[in-house]
C-alpha cells in the first residue's frame, strides 16, 4: 500500500514514551501506530522494528532511539521511544530528542517503579512540561480498586515533582490487547482515548519564529565603508532591517545597536527568520567590540550570567569521555552555542566524585558571562573533546 503523504498543514508536536523498563513503552508505541494506520494517519510499525532502535550519535554520545511519526485529525506527531534506561537519561539531558510532552507508561499490575520516578524527575528538570499517563497491562488486573490505587500513586508522584498530578489525564488500557485485537473497537478504544487526551492536554508549542529574536554570533568581519557584520544562524524569532538588537555575553555589559542590513547568500533581505544563515550589519559597532560566543537578541529577552546549576550526563570511556572520575573544583570548558568558556564545578553535598557514565546536578561558575536561559543545552569539553552534556536547570545569579 502506498504511504500517505504527510500534510504539513497540521501543527507539529514532538512527544515520546517514558517510564520503567518492561512496563510497555514500546508495545504502546506500536499500538498507537497500528490504530492510527487504520485511520490513514500512520504506517503501522511493529514492536521489533521499534525495539531494534538504530544507534545515533548526538554530540559524540551514542544513543539508541526509535522515531515514528503519525497524525491525528488535528495534529502531526513525531514520537521517540528508547529501548534502554540509559538511553532515556542521555536523550533527555542532551536534548537529542526534544519533547513538547511525554506519555508516561505505568504498568497497572506493578504500579510506579524506580525508573518511573526517575523519568518524571528528569522530565521536570529538562523542561518537559506536560505528561499524559497510560496505565498499561490493565488486562492483568482483575480488581478495579487496584487500578484506582495505582492511579492515586501516580498522581501523588507527579505532584511530588511539580506536575499537576490531580489534573493529569490518565488512560487505562492494554497495549498488547490492542495489537492482538486490531479489529475490535472495544479493545482499541484506549488508544483513541489516549490520543484525544494528548491532542487536548499537550499544547501546540510556540513556533520558533514566534519567539523573541536570537542569533548566536559565529563570525565577525568588516566591510569597508559599511561597518561590522556578524554572521550566524538565527536560532529563534525574526529580525528586520532597522530593528534594535542587543549584543550579549562574554562581558558584563550589554551593548545596544541597530541592524542596518541583512544578507543571505549574497542577497539583501528585509527580514531573516529562525533557521536562516545570515550576515547582520550592525550600526556603530567596532570590529573589536564583538566576538564569537556572543548572541544578538531582541532587547530585554535574554541576560548574561556566570553562575548556574546544570543537570549533566558524563560520557563513558567507550563514548570518548574521561577514563577517570573528576572531583569538586574540576575546571573544564563549557560549550554554549558557539564557544567554550572555562568554569569551575561544585558537586552536591555528600558527592565526593563523579564517574564516567553518571548523571548529576552540579553548580557551575563561569569565568565570563554567557547569554543563557533555563533549559539551554551545553557540552562539557576538555581540550576539544566532549566529556559531558548538560542542560541549565536554574540560573543562580
UniProtKB/Swiss-Prot annotation:
Give positions of region: G4: 136-139
Q: Which GO terms describe its molecular function?
A: GTP binding; GTPase activity; translation elongation factor activity
Q: Does the keyword Protein biosynthesis apply?
A: yes
Q: Where does GTP bind?
A: 19-26, 81-85, 136-139
InterPro entries xrefs:
EF-Tu_GTP-bd, EF-Tu_GTPase, EFTu-like_2, EFTU_2, G_TR_CS, P-loop_NTPase, Small_GTP-bd, T_Tr_GTP-bd_dom
| Primary location recorded for the protein, binned into one broad class | cytoplasm
Kindly state which keywords UniProt assigns to this record, in alphabetical order.
Cytoplasm, Elongation factor, GTP-binding, Hydrolase, Magnesium, Metal-binding, Nucleotide-binding, Protein biosynthesis
Q: Which reaction does it catalyse?
A: GTP + H2O = GDP + phosphate + H(+)
Q: What name appears for this protein in its UniProt entry? A: Elongation factor Tu
Q: Which species?
A: Clostridium botulinum (strain Loch Maree / Type A3)
Amino acid at each position: 500500500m502506498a504511504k500517505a503523504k504527510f500534510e504539513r498543514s497540521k501543527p507539529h508536536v514532538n512527544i515520546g514514551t517514558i517510564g520503567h523498563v518492561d512496563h510497555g513503552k514500546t508495545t504502546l508505541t506500536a499500538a498507537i501506530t497500528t490504530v492510527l494506520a487504520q485511520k490513514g494517519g500512520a504506517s503501522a510499525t511493529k514492536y521489533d522494528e521499534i525495539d531494534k532502535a538504530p544507534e545515533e550519535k548526538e554530540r559524540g554520545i551514542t544513543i539508541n532511539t526509535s522515531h515514528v511519526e503519525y497524525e491525528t485529525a488535528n495534529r502531526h506527531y513525531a514520537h521517540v521511544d528508547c529501548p534502554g534506561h540509559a538511553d532515556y537519561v542521555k536523550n533527555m539531558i542532551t536534548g537529542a530528542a526534544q519533547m513538547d510532552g511525554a506519555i508516561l507508561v505505568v504498568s497497572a499490575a506493578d504500579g510506579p517503579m524506580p525508573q518511573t520516578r526517575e523519568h518524571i524527575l528528569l522530565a521536570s528538570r529538562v523542561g518537559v512540561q506536560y505528561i499524559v499517563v497510560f496505565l498499561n497491562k490493565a488486562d492483568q488486573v482483575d480488581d478495579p480498586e487496584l487500578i484506582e490505587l495505582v492511579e492515586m500513586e501516580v498522581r501523588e508522584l507527579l505532584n511530588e515533582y511539580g506536575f499537576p498530578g490531580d489534573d493529569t489525564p490518565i488512560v487505562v488500557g492494554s497495549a498488547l490487547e490492542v495489537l492482538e485485537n486490531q479489529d475490535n473497537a472495544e479493545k482499541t478504544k484506549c488508544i483513541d482515548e489516549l490520543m484525544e487526551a494528548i491532542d487536548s492536554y499537550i499544547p501546540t508549542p510556540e513556533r520558533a519564529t514566534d519567539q523573541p529574536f536570537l542569533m548566536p554570533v559565529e563570525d565577525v568581519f568588516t566591510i569597508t565603508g559599511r561597518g561590522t557584520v556578524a554572521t550566524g544562524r538565527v536560532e529563534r524569532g525574526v529580525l528586520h532591517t532597522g530593528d534594535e538588537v542587543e549584543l550579549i555575553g562574554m562581558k558584563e555589559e550589554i551593548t545596544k545597536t541597530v541592524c542596518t542590513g541583512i544578507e543571505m547568500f549574497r542577497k539583501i533581505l528585509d527580514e531573516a527568520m529562525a533557521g536562516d544563515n545570515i550576515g547582520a550589519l550592525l550600526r556603530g559597532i567596532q570590529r573589536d567590540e564583538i566576538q564569537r560566543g556572543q548572541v544578538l537578541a531582541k532587547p530585554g529577552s535574554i541576560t548574561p550570567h556566570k553562575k548556574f546549576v546544570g543537570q549533566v550526563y558524563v560520557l563513558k570511556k567507550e563514548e570518548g569521555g574521561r577514563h577517570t572520575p573528576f572531583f569538586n573544583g574540576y575546571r573544564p570548558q563549557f560549550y554554549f552555542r558557539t564557544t567554550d568558556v572555562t568554569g569551575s564545578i561544585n558537586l552536591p553535598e555528600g558527592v565526593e566524585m563523579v564517574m564516567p557514565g553518571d548523571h548529576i546536578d552540579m553548580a557551575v561558575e563561569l569565568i565570563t558571562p554567557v547569554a543563557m536561559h533555563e533549559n539551554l543545552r551545553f557540552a562539557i569539553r576538555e581540550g576539544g573533546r566532549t566529556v559531558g552534556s548538560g542542560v541549565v536547570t536554574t540560573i543562580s545569579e
